[in-house]
Amino acid sequence: METPVIIPIHDPLITPLHSARDAVVGSDVQSMDLTPEQQEPVSEDWLDELALGLSEHGWMSLDMRARLGANLLAALKQEVQILDRTDAMKKAGIGRGSDLVRDRSVRRDKIAWLQGITAPQAALFEFFESIRQGLNQRLFLGLKRFETHYATYHAGDFYKQHLDSFKGRASRVVSLVLYLNEDWQAADGGELQVFNRDNDNEVCGTVLPESGRIAVFMSEEVPHEVLPANRTRYSLACWFRLDEVPLPL
């Protein structure tokens, strides 16, 4: 069996790790019941469907409420809400390390990296690990690990069209976004707009950021943007990567 390598990258220029840890450890979210009574396992058929969608179209959107379970989704939302009330969430930038640039004309969300240190995060990491192994078995992508962060978009926040990884960088290969917003309506804005990978002027899909829905796409190929939100919008982004060793702190 393949040995999992799960090493989230942390960038001290983006978020103070101890602040994020201290904000959620010991909070009420730790006592939430995560028993997966109604949770469906990640099946081979589901992984087949995901791999087929990525190989044929470069992206797909799926409803994961049944597979992740209401308890886990609620716990993750509570965590990001706690972080949003502290200084643990920082304005997101473009680039990494010394190349990090914060340009509010392009991107206005706030983020906090996950470390897998709480029960909800550990449960989520198991789900991501199943995807990593499943995609490797089906698409031979050679994914070594993943990194993930919470994101908060307040009213008026957006993220203009972009790619998650530049061609030839071979770092981020597959992107996944999980949404944590109940009762989200079209009038609330904040949709993920996905563009044709062969024509970035052509919209090929729009994803409403409702709780339990995920969007998965090839990081180097699929342009996308977050439209302006009209109320606070919570999500979680994950990238499956080729490199084994995280960037130095």
State each model region's role.
Residues M1-S175, Y179-I214, E220-L249:
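Fe(II)/2-oxoglutarate oxygenase catalytic core
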